[in-house]
Amino acid sequence: MTEYKLVIVGGGGVGKSALTIQLIQNHFIDEYDPTIEDSYRKQVSIDDETCLLDILDTAGQEEYSAMRDQYMRTGQGFLCVYSITSRSSYDEIASFREQILRVKDKDRVPLILVGNKADLDHERQVSVNEGQELAKGFNCPFMESSAKSRINVEEAFYSLVREIRKELKGDQSSGKAQKKKKQCLIL
């Protein structure tokens, strides 16, 4: 059975834990209890393939930023989450992505952009169009979700697994070409 290491990142209070617990335990946690780091595992079937999701729910607070490099190194795919009710959480997403790319030392990594708390449309500070434009700039899928209403919860995680699969297939088919490119000649 294939195992996928997913990391969920974003600012504090955007609903990372709520999304993860809704996926794993099928219930919504209403109270906000800042996460330092939690790990969850769930066996699922995605596109007729049984696989194991190893999900790392991370701290959004800045005081835990030193821990980020470590979990970014081990993650295969990243759910970048902001709250549609928080302009600042949206503005932070680019720096999370930049840190992921720097740590992974790649130009592109499997990533999904998620605008959470879609059930709070009356408190919206970030438009759907802004989310779509940011995702287009990142060259990644985008969706809005609601952990509370269970909207696009599974879809977000499953789409990320599909992105990882695409990346793995791309690495296999172009692996030989990439190895040939990395040559050094000293005269």
From Swiss-Prot:
GO annotations of cellular component type: cytosol; lipid droplet; macropinocytic cup; plasma membrane
Residues engaged in binding GTP: 10-17, 57-61, 116-119
UniProt keyword terms in alphabetical order: Cell membrane, GTP-binding, Hydrolase, Lipoprotein, Membrane, Methylation, Nucleotide-binding, Prenylation
Job description of the protein: Ras proteins bind GDP/GTP and possess intrinsic GTPase activity.
Protein name from the UniProt record: Ras-like protein rasD
Gene name of the record: rasD
Highest rank taxon of the organism: Eukaryota
Transmembrane region(s): none
Residues cleaved off as propeptide: 185-187
Primary localization class, coarse: membrane
